[in-house]
Amino acid sequence: MGVHGSNDVVNAWKQEVLNSRGKDAEHTLECCLDIERYAKEHKDAALLGFAYFYSGETYYLLNDVEHMFRNIAQAIHLLGQTGQWELIARSYNLMAISSVNKGNVSAAMDYYLTGLNYCRKYGITKMEISIMQNLGNLYMENGVYHEAQSYFEKAYSYCRSNPDVKENYVGLMASYVNLARCYMLQGMLDKTHAYIEKLDAECASYYEDIDILYVDCLKARYYHLTHNYVRRDAQIQEIVEIINKNVQIMEVFDDLC
């Protein structure tokens, strides 16, 4: 097979990875292995970094932390050599989330901040917003509310400057939910209510089921704390109906607990 034919095959593998990631772990890993073999044979560092990253991401989704870290560690060096900065930032984000899940807050903080530095240095705005939301959540979960609010507000500011409507709504929704939760944890229910109103006014028309689930969990807690049990029960009923649609509730497990 000539060079052009080989490139076509590799591009097809890469597209298969991008199409199947998060949907079909076995197929994604098979394609990554094909790419890895080809990249090693042809000494293609960029391609090998791509394969290791998406293998690591897939193992993360499978909750296989050992294989995730092994692949991501191999990916980072190669991604740095070949200037794939967004994948590096995403790598640090994945390692941070996994560290949080393992209870290693200090390691998670280091990974988040390193990822944030790459985002700021290379202008990776979308990933920067995600990491700021995650950092804010880490501070919030540990009771450092002022720092949490600072990151949520920075993320909100970035979202406001993003012209893409869909991405803008996703970021805004996350910012509003996180700020509402942060104020609610501090007992500042008037400010919580203000952000719930912003969610309804600015984001509701874009909601998908998973978004409604996040917001309903927030509202149910708020109505419980304000002793509005009729509205609380209505939100809980809506949550039950959405869960019965087989929404992936692990994505919002903390909110449901």
Predicted regions and their residues:
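Conserved alpha-helical positions within TPR/SEL1-like repeat arrays
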Residues: 14-21, 50-61, 86-101, 126-141, ...
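Amphipathic coiled-coil alpha-helices
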Residues: 12-13, 31, 52, 71, ...
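Solenoidal tandem-repeat scaffolds enriched in leucines and small polar residues
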Residues: 105-108, 115-191, 208-209
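Helix-coil-helix junctions within alpha-helical repeat/solenoid scaffolds
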Residues: 184-257
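Amphipathic alpha-helical segments of tetratricopeptide repeats
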Residues: 33-40, 73-83, 113-124, 153-164, ...
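Flexible inter-repeat linkers and adjacent short helices
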Residues: 1-88
